[in-house]
């Protein structure tokens, strides 16, 4: 039974995190990830991602798709409009972000990955393999600038390997495994972690966010406000 006190954190910015029904994307992506029991890529939630451009490739209207059930919270894939055409990308297998029920000391391991054929545009073939190892390593109360919450803490160790095949050169290579650790404080009735800390190798903090009150005008679609903060000292110890 822990007491985590992060009440003195100071936010540097605020973003809006909105969860939509999967059918609300208004494109062929919603058909690919339709909420149907016969669909292996079934989803019932989605969230907007960031648009970007890479050379001749323009990526817009990015969506992350999720399936929330009594057994798990998983990501079956994501999709975007690439050069004007919808491109769904299924994770095979899907990424199990949480496996329910979550109780103290419970664990689960999820293997996921996807492939992306960009040989006609960028001349590369890209694939990702991800291993997510979850451990519920604490329970108690956590205090942030927004309030005090009963919470479970989930530690997720994520190891990702990216592979590239360069079509014009006729060879491929894989990057060294990249390990990140996510600490998430989950509280009943909250749709997002009330606090999340992401770290890289050596415990270097790469991102922190906590559930916050709105500092801008609210609308009906807004699910929650997320404040991002800078934490010191950096790196942190295992007492995080």
Regions found by a protein language model. Give the residues of each.
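Acidic, serine/threonine-rich low-complexity disordered tracts
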Residues: 1-14, 110-218
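Extracellular-facing segments of soluble proteins and assemblies that are Gly/Ser/Thr-biased and enriched
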Residues: 48-131, 135-136
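Single, functionally critical "micro-switch" positions that shape active/binding sites
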Residues: 145, 232-233
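Short coil/turn motif common to extracellular beta-sandwich-like domains
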Residues: 235-240
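Solvent-exposed N-terminal domain segments of exported/luminal and surface proteins
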Residues: 1-70
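Short, solvent-exposed secondary-structure boundary motifs
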Residues: 42-59, 123-126, 172-177, 218-224
């Amino acid at each position: 039974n822990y007491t985590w006190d992060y009440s003195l954190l100071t936010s540097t910015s605020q973003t809006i995190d909105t969860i939509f029904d999967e059918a609300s994307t208004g494109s062929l992506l919603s058909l690919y990830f339709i909420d149907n029991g016969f669909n292996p890529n079934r989803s019932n939630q989605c969230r907007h991602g960031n648009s970007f451009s890479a050379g001749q490739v323009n990526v817009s209207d990015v969506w992350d798709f999720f399936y929330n059930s009594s057994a798990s919270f998983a990501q079956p894939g994501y999709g975007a409009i690439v050069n004007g055409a919808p491109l769904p990308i299924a994770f095979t297998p899907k990424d199990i972000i949480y496996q329910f029920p979550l109780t103290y000391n419970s664990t689960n391991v999820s293997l996921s990955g996807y492939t992306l054929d960009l040989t006609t545009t960028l001349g590369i073939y890209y694939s990702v393999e991800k291993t997510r190892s979850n451990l519920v390593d604490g329970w108690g109360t956590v205090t942030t600038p927004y309030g005090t919450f009963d919470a479970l803490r989930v530690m997720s160790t994520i190891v990702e390997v990216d592979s590239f095949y360069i079509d014009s050169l006729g060879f491929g290579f894989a990057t060294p495994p990249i390990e990140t650790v996510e600490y998430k404080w989950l509280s009943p009735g909250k749709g997002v972690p009330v606090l999340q800390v992401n770290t890289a190798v050596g415990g270097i903090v790469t991102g922190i966010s906590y559930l916050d009150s709105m500092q801008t005008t609210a609308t009906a679609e807004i699910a929650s406000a997320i404040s991002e903060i800078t934490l010191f000292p950096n790196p942190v110890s295992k007492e995080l």
